[in-house]
Amino acid sequence: MNKHSFNVLEFDKLKELILANIVIDHNREVIENLEPYKDLSALNNELKTVKDFMDLLSFDGGFEAIGLRNINSLMEKIKLIGTYLEVEELWNINVNLRTVRIFKSRLDELGKYKQLREMIGNIPNLRVIEDVINKTINPEKEIKDDASLDLRDIRLHKKTLNMNIKRKFEELFEEPSLSNAFQEKIITERDGRMVTPVKYDFKGLIKGIEHDRSSSGQTVFIEPLSIVSLNNKMRELETKEKEEIRKILLRIAELLRNNKDDILIIGEKVMYLDILNAKSIYAVENRCEIPTVSNKEILSLEKARHPFIDKDKVTPLTFEIGKDYDILLITGPNTGGKTVALKTAGLLTLMALSGIPIPASENSKIGFFEGVFADIGDEQSIEQSLSSFSAHLKNVKEILEAVTKNSLVLLDELGSGTDPIEGAAFAMAVIDYLNEKKCKSFITTHYSQVKAYGYNEEGIETASMEFNTDTLSPTYRLLVGIPGESNALTIAQRMGLPESIISKAREYISEDNKKVEKMIENIKTKSQELDEMRERFARLQEEARLDRERAKQETLIIEKQKNEIIKSAYEEAEKMMNEMRAKASALVEKIQHEEKNKEDAKQIQKNLNMLSTALREEKNKTVEVVKKIKTKVNFKVGDRVFVKSINQFANILKINTSKESAMVQSGILKLEVPFDEIKIVEEKKEKVYNVNNHKKTPVRSEIDLRGKMVDEAVYELETYLDRATLNGYTEVYVIHGKGTGALREGILKYLKACKYVKEYRIGGHGEGGLGCTVVTLK
């Protein structure tokens, strides 16, 4: 990098925009000396951190930089024992410690901004220093009265003494003989002594010491003799106060020295946060983004804007160097924006390599160039003197001596300022040299010979700045792939110059130049046609995308409606099945009560089968709406199961896999039910417990059903009573607990219909009370 390139690309002017946001004076020098990074890893780390800070500023309130100071320079002042900081300096240290601590806490709470959290995560906690300073200094940056016991006593004495002095003056003011002596009845101070303004002509009336006179000489400031001793005492107290404050400041200085290393770490973080904040404010205000910077030798800018042109008026530039070609040659007349395009490329590259976001799309890519070299002349001058051409040659010579494959070269109006033929030849020779070195270059020229040369050479792409011949003004659009036209005669014709002059001028143009201009015109026409095709294609793509979006939305609506229908169908089916289960349960209960009436039993069996068939039909209707999931069979013939539709236990008689149903028997009832109405029941071993210290006798036994569901409890009770009857028990205890009473009600309902039960009663005293039912067996 060289200073000349920085100057012509106005990098220092860009830094001034960032300096406007700097708070700490020391950092102004840091920004002024800012230049491209030497290490790619360090640069990318900086860009990531700046990106985090930009997002923090945009979405989470940013960072409060007001009050930040270079506290490291303050620490230098107290290196030696016996030195201390003034009150305001201590307050500045306190503000910085608190700012960083609160900022770290905020980042931890947000839980994002990884780069920022890693940067600030290792700072030490110096809350103890904050507390000491806060207890010593108030927000008005004054030492508090209670900073020490001695200081409190001194200030209390001063307050009392001050009241006495005021009282003495008031007595003087009230003296009738002195009513005309005072210029004003006020107390003021001169040389640290309390005095009052007295008219010059009456000064002899008041005995005291004259300390000062007004500029007119009409007023003298006198310390009355009655106040002198009090003033002397006040001076003594003030001296003691200053000494006590000095001791307090020395103690705090010692505390700071003991924590010097930690304070210096925080000081460095504070200064870095100030720089990050300044860069980020500039970036957010100017709609800047972080480009990709890599070792690839490429310069690809998308929607790039020059930082010094109004962001709402500038025409963005898009181009790429380093992929299909190494040199971009912009041709065409002056005033078309060629130099602005060249400066945009150079300045944005310097910004990115220096860790500054650029006014361009985040899709932009910039190579980690070893050097950025620029030679930019005054493109608007009508004549260039030999001296300016010599300076131009000197700059080009220095650039060619320094460039490598990994350099970016920016040359404005190469070869201008001398004979056009020699200037064009010189320009082509320089371009050849840069092309051989594979050096990434951005070059502007208005020579026709160079246009034709660039169009035909390998590794070079021509471009031009669009010019509106109707309005006779540039549009500042960069047209890559299209060489620039001079437009001089076209402009002259539109401005009304005689046609004879225009025709004669065309005759003077050489055939070669005419061919070049014709070639450019054809290329421009084809390019415009291609642009129109691209626009049509883009419109069609957008229409197709919108159609896809509409179709997607319609599909979502249909899917939602379908789900609502399915939900409604399920709810209706569930309602009907619950009704059928209730009817089935009632039929079963009726069968058990009227078991002896065979005709009624047959009719009930028939009704139950009809209900079972209806239940299956309802299930099938629901399946038509939603594809049925095949039920997994986990039972076999002979298994004991619970049938949900009739709310009863039964045994499997037959399994019909194709129909996904099974024939079951519950008591004398036989019916076919779907698989999903069947629940396998595993037999459990009985547990035997004592109830409320009830003594077990040879003829008594218990079953504990507490904590079980009603269905499960009834099944276990039924099995238990079978065994109890076989074992000859005449009385058993069924423990169900008190609870909500639901389990007890279910068990009593079962006992009422059970064929083994003769009678039952609630447990008595010592038998469990309401928590136990005593059952007498037949």
Curated annotation (Swiss-Prot):
Enzymatic class: hydrolase
Keywords carried by this UniProt record: ATP-binding, DNA-binding, Endonuclease, Hydrolase, Nuclease, Nucleotide-binding, RNA-binding, rRNA-binding
Role, per record: Endonuclease that is involved in the suppression of homologous recombination and thus may have a key role in the control of bacterial genetic diversity.
Binding site for ATP: 332-339
A Pfam entry, by short name: MSSS
Protein name in the entry: Endonuclease MutS2
Known partners and oligomeric status: Homodimer. Binds to stalled ribosomes, contacting rRNA.
GO molecular function: ATP binding; ATP hydrolysis activity; ATP-dependent DNA damage sensor activity; double-stranded DNA binding; endonuclease activity; mismatched DNA binding; ribosomal large subunit binding; rRNA binding
PANTHER family, alphabetized: OS10G0509000 PROTEIN-RELATED, SMR DOMAIN-CONTAINING PROTEIN
Similarity annotation: Belongs to the DNA mismatch repair MutS family. MutS2 subfamily.
